[in-house]
Each structure stands twice: as structure tokens, then as C-alpha cells.
Amino acid sequence: MSLHFELVTPARLVRSEEVHMVVVPGTDGEFGVLEGHAPFMSTVKDGAIKVYRSAGAAPEEIQVQGGFAEVSAKGLTVLAEHVEG
């Protein structure tokens, strides 16, 4: 079982992949998303998105600046204003 994760900026699609879990720096605090998470939307603050490719794996950190996150039946989409790297 996996979560479909997409990271998008106004300029390009940065990531589109299947992962175990993603932790997002929401403006009201960090939140983790696994497959089957209830749908919701949140604004994203500047910080690191942590991508866990498998259970127990060390996270890959992706620095983002602002944006929105949407969790739906299709997975997690983060629309970031800017992604470093």
C-alpha cells in the first residue's frame, strides 16, 4: 500500500511518485499523510516536507516556501510557491 505524492510549483512538476508517508509543514503545525487519509486542505508554511519512501526509512527533506496542500482520494498534492533544488 502506498500514497501517491505530487509536489508542484507554478513553473513545473517537481515530483510525482508513490511513497509510504509525507510530513508537511502546515501553518497550524506539521501533519503526516498516509494512504487512506481523510480529505482536507491546508496552507503550507516555509519549511521541510519529509518524504518517507518506506516504513522505517529515513526521510528525504525537501525545502519549500509557502503554498497549499490537498489530501484527496487520489493522494497528496502540494502546490508550493517555491522549492529549493
UniProtKB/Swiss-Prot annotation:
Bilayer topology: Peripheral membrane protein
Keyword field contains Cell wall biogenesis/degradation: no
Cellular localisation: Cell inner membrane
Keywords for this protein: ATP synthesis, Cell inner membrane, Cell membrane, CF(1), Hydrogen ion transport, Ion transport, Membrane, Transport
InterPro entries per the UniProt record, alphabetical: ATP_synth_F1_dsu/esu, ATP_synth_F1_dsu/esu_N, ATPsynth_dsu/esu_N
Keyword Transit peptide: no
Molecular function terms, GO-annotated: ATP binding; proton-transporting ATP synthase activity, rotational mechanism
Record field: transmembrane: none
Gene Ontology CC, one term: proton-transporting ATP synthase complex
Signal peptide: none
PANTHER family, alphabetized: ATP SYNTHASE DELTA/EPSILON CHAIN, ATP SYNTHASE EPSILON CHAIN, CHLOROPLASTIC
Subunit structure: F-type ATPases have 2 components, CF(1) - the catalytic core - and CF(0) - the membrane proton channel. CF(1) has five subunits: alpha(3), beta(3), gamma(1), delta(1), epsilon(1). CF(0) has three main subunits: a, b and c.
Record HAMAP family: ATP_synth_epsil_bac
Family of the protein in this entry: Belongs to the ATPase epsilon chain family.
Function field: Produces ATP from ADP in the presence of a proton gradient across the membrane.
Name the UniProt record assigns to this protein: ATP synthase epsilon chain
